[in-house]
Regions:
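Active-site rim elements
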Residues: 169-171, 225-226, 266-277, 305-313, ...
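C-terminal helix-rich "cap/oligomerization" subdomain common to oxidoreductases
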Residues: 10-35, 314-317, 399-433, 445-515
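Non-transmembrane alpha-helical segments in soluble domains
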Residues: 9, 83, 106-109, 118, ...
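Core domains of carbohydrate- and sulfate-ester-processing enzymes
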Residues: 198-256, 374, 379, 383, ...
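N-terminal glycine-/serine-/threonine-rich beta1-alpha1-beta2 phosphate-ribose binding loop
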Residues: 2-139, 154-166, 512
Length: 515
């Protein structure tokens, strides 16, 4: 097993300097592994994401040194099902396994034999468990969005710096070749200076999907999380955790091992962060990567002027159209990031010499300039129709979704990525972005090398802040100033005068995040 730095970490001079600093902060694990011993992984949260997306990936890391030994969930059926899946997987490979099913994550964090945890709970639990895990000396993989609130994002960032743990945010698109290719073209200035960026997600307020921002569902009886007969297999008080007490609901916590998606809790403002925290956490993350803002953020938020939604399910609020304005690190000029509904492309970068558009399983590059993009231009790009002033360089648009390895399985996409890499000489470009084969594999390798991951706490935390700023703009129907250094409202900001808080509205005693 060769886990040296050059084997999987690549960066520009600036990125290398940051990595070196981060390396010094990654302390050793709390226990020393014997020769041939595996690092023990605890899965916390065995819903559809933890069970079907993350557990198989962690099981696949056995050969590089990690073994799942605990499945933790406050739902008895889910944790026992998870433990059985683990034992069955290892048994088929002739590997001894006695995976434990644990009800309370606090018991997991007290266990000195656990080396790393994977957190795949609903959003409202992420920050508390992540910080407590780091305090306990565990390395942490946490699903996106990293946090429920902006204040929690600041605390998770501070906790990683304080406790020096290896930390990975589950923003797995960064580990996909198609997204890295797009970001490499942008970061190397190959389409000129970036002036505008689109992040497209959500349903534009249509009845087809949930709201961009979480809402108070009890305000709409037809869509409320209705009371249900108590589920004897769920510790409901633990499921609620820091959120307000409410009666058990089958909609919030569907019974047993199921395939229910999208999760109802995602759009309830006591538990989730809406589409901004769901898909926004992916496409805003790629925008953040492409414009080199992993350690910064916008300085101004501009209110949407799109129509209000007309149904209570979307809160009667605007669903897209807000903008975030960043200062370019190159020359201080403005970069406008727009939240749009033009769904073909997750992230679109508009430069002075071209356009790059990317999504899962698809990428397109045009040369030329369109200036400030209009709705007509955005729709034409989404439909792959001609746009005056632009010439297609290369495009592959035949596939919507896939796994981390999907890029390798789609021959058309692989060919397009190679065409772009060759044309723009990306392998020898001056800016080399972190190259990760897989988000989980990268995390496990970093456990052994003590190197920073591709999506450490600051990257994930900054991304969560973008999601939170989007939600704030829609919920309060406002624009405002932002201090990206302090990660706070600037003095005199209208939000301060309105009494808007960066903290969660309510937190039950005992579950406050304390660094």
């Amino acid at each position: 097993m060769n886990l040296n730095r050059r084997g999987f970490l690549f960066g520009s001079a600036a990125a290398t300097a940051v990595a070196a600093t981060a390396q010094n902060c990654c302390k050793l694990g709390t226990r020393k592994l014997a020769a041939g011993e595996k690092a023990n992984v605890a899965m916390i949260g065995l819903g559809i994401q933890g069970r079907t997306a993350l557990l198989p990936q962690f099981l696949a890391q056995y050969d590089i040194g990690a073994k799942v030994t605990v499945c933790c969930d406050c739902d008895k059926e889910r944790r026992e099902d998870g433990a059985k899946r683990v034992n069955d997987f290892y048994s088929k490979k002739g590997i001894p396994s006695a995976c434990k099913a644990v009800a309370d994550f606090r018991d997991v964090l007290k266990d000195p034999m656990i080396d790393m945890v994977c957190i795949a709970t609903p959003d409202h639990w992420h920050a508390y468990i992540a910080v407590e895990a780091m305090k306990a000396g565990k390395d942490v993989y946490c699903e996106k969005p990293l946090t429920f609130s902006i204040d929690e994002a600041r605390k998770v960032i501070a906790a990683q710096k304080k406790y020096g743990r290896v930390f990975q945010t589950g923003s797995m698109q960064r580990s996909w070749p198609v997204f890295r290719t797009a970001a490499m073209i942008v970061r190397n200035g190959l389409i000129g200076d970036i002036k505008y960026v689109d992040a497209n997600y959500g349903r534009g307020g249509q009845k087809l999907g949930g709201p961009s921002h979480p809402i108070r569902f009890f305000d709409d009886p037809k869509n409320a999380a209705t009371e249900s007969a108590p589920n004897p297999n769920v510790d409901w008080d633990m499921w609620l955790g820091p959120a307000k007490w409410r009666a058990y609901s089958d909609q919030l916590a569907p019974r047993g091992v199921n395939k229910f998606y999208p999760m109802f809790w995602r759009f309830d403002d006591d538990f989730g962060t809406g589409y901004n925290g769901d898909w926004g956490a992916h496409h805003l993350d790629i925008a953040q990567w492409g414009i080199d803002m992993d350690d910064s953020g916008p300085y101004k938020i501009i209110r949407s002027d799109e129509p209000y939604s007309t149904d209570l399910y979307h809160g009667g609020r605007r669903q897209f159209g807000m903008k975030m304005i960043f200062k370019s690190k190159k020359d201080g000029s403005d970069i406008e990031l727009y939240h749009g509904p033009f769904g073909t492309w997750g992230t679109v970068f508009y430069g002075t010499k071209g356009v790059v558009a990317v999504n899962r399983g698809k990428i397109a590059v045009w040369e030329g300039e369109v200036g400030k993009p209009t709705a007509e231009i955005r729709q034409a790009l989404a439909d792959m129709k001609p746009v005056a002033g632009l010439t297609v360089v290369a495009a592959s648009v035949g596939k919507d979704y896939g796994t981390d390895s999907s890029d390798k399985k789609d021959d058309r996409l692989t060919a397009t990525i190679k065409t772009l890499s060759d044309k723009y000489q990306l392998e020898t470009a001056s800016v080399q972005l972190y190259k990760s084969p897989n988000q989980v594999e990268n995390f496990v390798k970093c456990y052994f090398t003590r190197m920073p991951t591709i999506s450490p706490a600051e990257v994930g935390g900054r991304g969560s802040i973008l999601c939170g700023l989007c939600n704030m703009s829609y919920v309060y129907d406002t624009g405002f100033g932002w201090d990206p250094v302090k990660m706070d409202f600037p003095e005199g900001c209208s939000c301060r005068k309105m009494g808007i808080s960066l903290k969660r509205e309510f937190c039950r005693n005992g579950w406050e995040v304390v660094v």
